[in-house]
Amino acid sequence: MAKFMCTHTLPAGKFSSEQLRQFAQAAQQDATVKGYRSFANLAEGRAVCVMEAQNKDEVAAWFQKMGMPFDTITKVELEGERGNIHAA
């Protein structure tokens, strides 16, 4: 599966940490997409996550099914950590 970097603008006060936890857990149970990593700042209404799926359309369909707003879904070509960059 490919990795997709997703950005979200969350309506202020609409999402709690528990709701985001439920989204993350649901992504682990789905047959089409898998959650890989998430970052969020609820006070500023911003979140970024990395999802694994066969294609961008599967990720978009999953977000729509779950009622999770999203701004962008971008296929990850390179990833890195602590100065090491490699193909995704």
For every predicted segment, state its role.
Residues M1-T32, N41-G45, K56, L78-A88:
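Short S/T/G/P-rich N-terminal loop/turn motif that feeds into the first structured element of a domain
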Residues D30-V33, Q54-E79:
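An amphipathic, aromatic/His-enriched active-site/gating alpha helix that lines ligand/cofactor pockets
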Residues R37-S38:
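Hydrophobic/aromatic beta-strand elements that line small-molecule binding cavities or substrate pockets
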